[in-house]
From Swiss-Prot:
Organism of this sequence: Scheffersomyces stipitis (strain ATCC 58785 / CBS 6054 / NBRC 10063 / NRRL Y-11545) (Yeast)
Transmembrane domains' residue ranges: 43-63
GO terms under cellular component: MICOS complex
Mitochondrial intermembrane side: 64-548
Residues covered by region (Disordered): 14-35
Mitochondrial matrix side: 14-42
Transit peptide boundaries: 1-13
Protein name, per record: MICOS complex subunit MIC60
UniProt-listed GO biological process terms: cristae formation
Function according to Swiss-Prot or TrEMBL: Component of the MICOS complex, a large protein complex of the mitochondrial inner membrane that plays crucial roles in the maintenance of crista junctions, inner membrane architecture, and formation of contact sites to the outer membrane. Plays a role in keeping cristae membranes connected to the inner boundary membrane. Also promotes protein import via the mitochondrial intermembrane space assembly (MIA) pathway.
Record's keyword terms, sorted: Coiled coil, Membrane, Mitochondrion, Mitochondrion inner membrane, Transit peptide, Transmembrane, Transmembrane helix
């Protein structure tokens, strides 16, 4: 009788056991990595969320201090601690902010990191103990099942000769795996369970799903039931702790809210009092400014009204004056057309008479001015041309100034006086020589001219002595010789001209001399020309006054 080997079923069972062990080890490693990842990701999310919320809160409060719309939104939504934060931004400092945050944080009692870590480790250790206990019981059950299967096969299967003579038969078994019920939490506890606890429960459920129901003994089922109860109890404790933590947090928040409300009310009362005080002060200032401005406007209005009244009265007066003038003009026109019909003729005669009176007045004024000029000119002539050597010399300038003041705005007279003034400004009544005085000086100059005419060129002392001696033998010429070029002829013509009162001819003759004779007669020529210029200018003024 051939014995059917059980090696295939054994191999299937061993492979399932090995797969179960590998899967359990993989599940343990996966569960551990998942817990570490969950812890790190949860801490990172909490920190990032806190930082983001802090930045958004601070930016909103800062913008509210600059924008009225954002401030209205903050007040309407009653954002927590918005008054303290805005007051700190506007009036506070960094130290005040730190102290306020420390005070608020110290008033709230939260579980420490050590407590949370200890709770997480306790849950992890409990889960690991349960997992190890489950593995141990599964391995013992598998060992018992292997011993029972090998005992029935006996000695025939264990003999190597029989096993070599028999060909192994392979049995194809269709494996239908049933799973144990998963661990489920109570609905009242789910909302309070931490994420790490939920992850642990999910890991247990994965482990339970990997176990084949057909290979589980009643002992294993009891163990799984115990694990389920312990996990549910642990989740309930965690939920209770979370609920207790939330209750304590809510109580702390209520206390903080009450304190905040009281501080808010106190701050509101202080701000209201300050605003009322500031409002009263601003109102007093505005009232004083308004009263002062009203006084200024009233004064300006009074001045404007008075000026307008004065202008109106002036306009009325002007209008009445125009009406009166128009009435008088109309009345005069009526009288002119009636009783005063010959008034136009009388008016023309009066105009002609007025023109005659004006011309007569101008002639009288011109005659009077002419007489004044003639009088001043006569005084100047008397001083210039009629000089008494016995009288005391007088300056001629006052006479010239008197003539200048009395002269009209005539261009010729003004030019003549302009030349006469500088000429006679430094002269006196005795400095302008008359014709007789010039003749006397000429006679005194004649001997020197005669001796100078006999000097040779570059004459020395002997030449001067010889000229003096020989000049005594010269015969004087009397009369006028127009064609004579010698010195005696010139002397005769000059004397004849001075006797005839022809000073201009005599001066011209002397001015035409050459050499030493001209140099000796230079002073006489200057005096003669001064006399001639004065006579010419005075005669020019006299002639111009006659034709005025």
């Amino acid at each position: 009788m051939a014995v059917r080997p059980l090696s295939a079923s054994a191999r299937v069972w061993s492979s399932s056991v090995s797969e179960t062990g590998k899967s359990s080890q993989g599940q343990d490693q996966k569960h551990e990595n998942y817990q570490n990842h969950q812890q790190s990701s949860l801490a990172g999310i909490v920190i990032k969320s806190a930082l983001f919320a802090t930045v958004v809160y601070g930016a909103t409060m800062f913008i509210a201090t600059k924008n009225d719309k954002v401030m209205d939104f903050v007040i309407d939504q009653q954002i927590p601690y918005y008054e303290e934060t805005i007051d700190l931004i506007e009036n506070g400092s960094y130290d005040d902010l730190v102290s306020a945050i420390k005070a608020k944080i110290s008033s709230i009692r939260l579980p420490s990191k050590d407590e949370i870590t200890e709770l997480s480790h306790k849950i992890e250790h409990t889960s690991e103990d349960l997992l190890k206990e489950t593995k141990r019981k599964l391995e013992s059950a598998r060992a018992e099942f292997g011993s029972h299967s090998t005992a029935g096969s006996g000695t025939s299967a264990s003999l190597p000769a029989n096993q070599l003579q028999k060909h192994p038969e392979i049995e194809h078994v269709k494996k239908e795996v049933e799973h144990l019920p998963a661990i489920k939490l109570n609905e009242n506890v789910v909302s309070y369970v931490d994420a790490s606890v939920k992850a642990t429960i999910d890991s247990f459920n994965d482990l339970i799903n990997s176990i084949d129901v057909s290979k589980v003994t009643p002992t294993d089922e009891g163990l799984i039931k115990t694990i389920n109860e312990k996990v549910s109890e642990l989740a309930s404790k965690v939920g209770a702790l979370s609920k207790k933590f939330d209750d304590e947090l809510q109580s702390k928040l209520k206390v903080s809210q009450t304190e905040l409300l009281s501080s808010y009310t106190k701050k509101e009362l202080e701000l209201t009092e300050n605003l009322l005080h500031q409002f009263n002060r601003e109102r007093a200032q505005l009232e004083s400014k308004l009263n002062e401005r009203l006084k200024q406007e009233i004064a300006a209005t009074k001045e404007t009204i008075s000026q307008a009244a004065v202008n109106a009265v002036s306009m009325v007066r002007i209008e009445q004056t125009k009406n009166f003038e128009k009435l008088v003009a109309d009345k005069i026109n009526e009288e002119r057309n009636g009783k005063l019909a010959n008034l136009e003729k009388l008016n023309s005669r009066l105009e002609s008479l007025e023109q005659f009176a004006e011309s007569l007045e101008s002639q009288v004024v011109a005659t009077q001015q002419k007489s004044v000029i003639q009088k001043s000119l006569s005084s100047l002539k008397a001083v210039l041309f009629v000089s008494n050597p016995e009288e005391k010399p007088q300056s001629i300038k006052p006479y010239v100034d008197d003539l200048f003041e009395s002269s009209p705005d005539d261009e010729v007279i003004q030019l003549a006086l302009g030349e006469l003034g500088p000429l006679l400004s430094k002269e006196s009544t005795q400095s302008i020589l008359t014709t007789s005085q010039l003749l006397t000086r000429w006679e005194q100059l004649v001997p020197e001219l005669r001796s100078a005419s006999l000097l040779p060129p570059n004459a020395g002392l002997l030449g001067h002595l010889a000229s003096i001696v020989f000049s005594k033998f010269l015969v004087s010429v009397k009369g006028d010789k127009p064609d004579g070029k010698d010195i005696e002829s010139v002397i005769g013509r000059v004397e004849a001209s001075l006797v005839r009162d022809e000073l201009d001819v005599a001066v011209e003759e002397v001015a035409n001399l050459k050499g030493w004779t001209r140099k000796l007669a230079n002073d006489w020529v200057i005096e003669g020309r001064k006399r001639l210029e004065a006579e010419y200018l005075v005669e020019l003024i006299d002639a111009e006054t006659r034709i005025l």
